[in-house]
């Protein structure tokens, strides 16, 4: 990632952090920059009921606010769904993998339907329990693993993404 792009993502991160703090959402949504780009991490408990892929109505405004800032840039945006490793028991989804994918797809659909995103710049991915950020042995770790990551991809991935869809 070049210096110009890094500054652009850092400015976007600062803008998001301020907006989230002003809305009291900074405990439920966090941001960081890593080698992939700007990562916006959403705590699933705020945005989804357990075992459900439907975005909670009271959380839609936060997603729309975040999307409004992201819609000003040209980068690809990948929405990743993640779960803990506890098997689903009462759900329309046979596995955590399918649940995580459905959640990612619903966030992408919201970005398109309510925020006028271009569908060709959005990617929905479900990882289920297979990319944890914390230990699934504790309740706290499982809670951290239940998340949606909205990633503003570094432009170094643009050519790769365009080649994959050809």
Q: What positions do the PLM features span?
A:
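Generic recognition of flexible, low-complexity loop/linker segments
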Residues: 27-28, 66, 137
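Periplasmic OmpA-like peptidoglycan-binding domain that tethers envelope proteins to the cell wall
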Residues: 12, 41, 47-62, 72, ...
């Amino acid at each position: 990632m070049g210096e110009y792009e890094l500054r652009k993502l850092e400015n976007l991160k600062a803008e998001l952090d301020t907006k989230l703090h002003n809305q009291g959402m900074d405990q439920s949504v966090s941001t960081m920059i890593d080698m992939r780009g700007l990562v916006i991490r959403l705590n699933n408990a705020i945005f989804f009921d357990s075992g459900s892929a439907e975005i909670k109505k009271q959380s839609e405004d936060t997603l729309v606010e975040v999307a409004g800032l992201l819609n000003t840039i040209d980068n690809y945006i990948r929405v990743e769904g993640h779960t803990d490793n506890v098997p689903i028991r009462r759900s329309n989804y046979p596995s955590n993998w399918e649940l995580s994918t459905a959640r990612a797809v619903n966030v992408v659909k919201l970005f398109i339907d309510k925020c006028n995103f271009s569908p060709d710049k959005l990617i929905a991915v479900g990882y289920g329990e297979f990319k944890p950020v914390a230990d699934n042995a504790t309740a706290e770790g499982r809670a951290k693993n239940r998340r949606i990551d909205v990633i503003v991809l570094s432009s170094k991935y643009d050519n790769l993404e365009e080649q994959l869809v050809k």
